[in-house]
Amino acid sequence: MRTIKLFKMLPAVFLILASVVSPIWAADRKEQFTYTPFVPTDPIMPLSQVKPGMRGECRTVVKGDDIVSFDAEVVDILDAGSSPEKLILIKASGPIVEKSGIAAGMSGSPFYIGGRLVGAIGYGFNFTDHKLGLVTPIEEMLEVWNNPEIIPSFELPPLVAEKPPSSADAREPNLQESSQNVVSADTPPADVVIEEVLPTSGDLPISGDDAVSGDRSVSSDDGDIRASWDLLVSRDRAVSSDRTVSDDSKSGGFFISGVSGRMAREMKNTLNAETVPFGGAPAGAVPPLNYAPDVRPGMAIGVSLLWGDVDASSVGTLTALSKDGRFIAYAHPLLNLGPTAAVLRTARISSVVPGIESSFKIGSPGDIIGIVTQDRPQGIGGRIGRFAPAASVVVKVTDVDSGRTYRKSFQMVQDKYMLSKLAAPAIVGCIEDLWGRIGGGTAKITAKFTGSALRGGWQRTNMFVSENDVATQVLEEFKLLMQMFAVNQFQEIRPFGVDVEVEVTQEPRVLYIEDVKVSGEGPFSPGEKVEFDITLRPWRKDPFVRTYSLTVPEKVSGTAQLLVRGGGIAEESAEYTNEAWRSISSLTILLSELDVKESNDQIVMEIRGQESLGKQIERAKSGDADALMNDKLKSEIRDEKMKEGSVRVVRANYYIDGIIQKLIKIDGDSD
């Protein structure tokens, strides 16, 4: 027995290359509206009056923006077993359907009997007679509006009150490390730049380019030099964003344009959406705002999640309007998100393409005419003339090898889960598309995040090197960054913007730590400076030497460890990481902690050691809990160690690889 596969009449997908829409900005404040029944401007025919054999017409667009109609006959009323609970089986006829049958992109095409609205086409059948389709009854489509409507506001969100940690007031502001700690320096190659990284002291700063990175292994089985990110302790992490954006079925049809092919597939998989071939507007076209569009049932419409130089838009059909400016469309969910704030646009159809599996429309979205606020099992709904706030993204890529610089910008729906899951592959897809290649090389990424809760913005710089695929490393980091900002548990951030500057080259820009030599044999005393030479070798270039000094901590005695390593290598073993006990309690503190996460372009130097056994016993006997527990943040502990001189961090314009440790003898009570 042959199985008939049922498919949702997916909207045809059209992605365009267009400029950013300036008036649409990030915001997401929720204004609650009381429930108001949706009353279509067309009279309706209830399902109880629909009988097999009744004939009517469906209205849709098959070319340009002209609404045409084709005949359809009711075959039967089917039990769907879920929402929608009933479906009307129809058989279409006439010249239009003879060419292609019922096609993807006809979702929402209204079905009338005797001038009364019965419902809209929502589903069809794969690999079978494309003249057969399923209509969602209008009574069930009206249930889209039986839900609270949430319309985003352009107002700034209220700031969540936070009590600053008591220890923060005592932190020394604007600390500058003395230049006398750099004893001498050999001359590196002209293209190597090494700069000091200062402590993050101050009133828990929100910005700093020495932030966030994570535990990194020097090599892996496939030879990549990899970077991963251990984003704080699990209980301190941002709220999980593992909300599925669709059910097991493939709701909606999306094909991503303006990004590399594999990042388009990444976004497709994230959306769990079907894709169909697309048309498109001219590259760089700006979708204008149309405050008074001519809207009619049966017209082609587009719904956009991203638009601008990166665009992801679904094209379907408008089903019905109400006098208060609301609409219903599609007759099935787009992504079944519930409340949403996607952009509603006009659409122009180029053609309907016949297919063996299914037919589909080719077209392109046009003017922005409103907002989609409901994405429900029975269809989508929204308002004409209301405009959705959005997040803004700018990506600038400089190809060091060619000397060329490229730029893309786009906006996307300000939905915390969409931002968390779609922004990262969209950004990395822009990088790959502008670079024009996928493979090994070096990427320096500087990302600045802006929003009402980020005073002056928050910035993070990192470098990545791979023998095989440098972009995948960048993707993982951006996923974590976007997750943190979009779904952090402390504060809504809007307007929300991301500016990304990228430098890429095929050359492995790696600086290897080859050797460390301590000046003098010791023993050294607590508080004394220890000088040492670090031999560094750029990839396939002559080595050079830099001389630094660290101060022996006052409490250390016996044998201590002088450790020099690349940022992110063995970061989890750093003493300031292990000693921190206090949890993160605000967005400000979260960002302050991320400011001290190491990056791959840093050289980290530290002296590690233990108190003498006698002092440890004495402290334990005192019974003073404060003496036994360190109620401080990691950032505060690292700043203290940098102030005392036992920890030192410098940043280079290279990826730093290697880890070397030396043992040094310390005078003092070693009992």
Predicted features and spans:
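Bacterial N-terminal signal peptides that target proteins for export
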Residues: R2-P11
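Bacterial N-terminal signal peptides
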Residues: P11-V20
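Terminal presequence/propeptide segments associated with secretion/organelle targeting
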Residues: W25-D671
